[in-house]
Amino acid sequence: MRDSEEVPGIDREPLQGDAVHLADRIKEELDLLARNVDILEKLAKSPPIGIIRLSEALELPIHKTRYSLHLLEREGVIQPSADGAVVTDRAAEFWSSLNRSLDRMTELIEHLRSRAVEHQSRPPSGRKGY
């Protein structure tokens, strides 16, 4: 998923003033995760590849590619080499952990969606304040 793609069901209108939807912040983190996954997949399928070729192959700005490479290296799933970044043995552990995390997030999202639908169908209570 590219940064410009929209996630269905997330209203993009800001709250009053400069307030930001909590869902927008979560979506930004998911966009970053998706970019990291794209990069890790590309590195796993390719021989060592440098940052410029990687950016071009994934149609990403170099600064975003560099940041994702930094995060993946910090996690220990890639390491630099003379020819570019390479995937380490810890990648398998990363994929397992990601799958578990996504399962937990999916459960939480389904729970939140059911609560949001429930509240959306209720008439306002008319109460003011907290």
Language-model segment annotations:
Residues 83-100:
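Basic, amphipathic "hinge/linker" alpha-helix immediately C-terminal to the N-terminal HTH DNA-binding motif
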Residues 1-12, 83, 129-130:
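Long, compositionally biased intrinsically disordered regions
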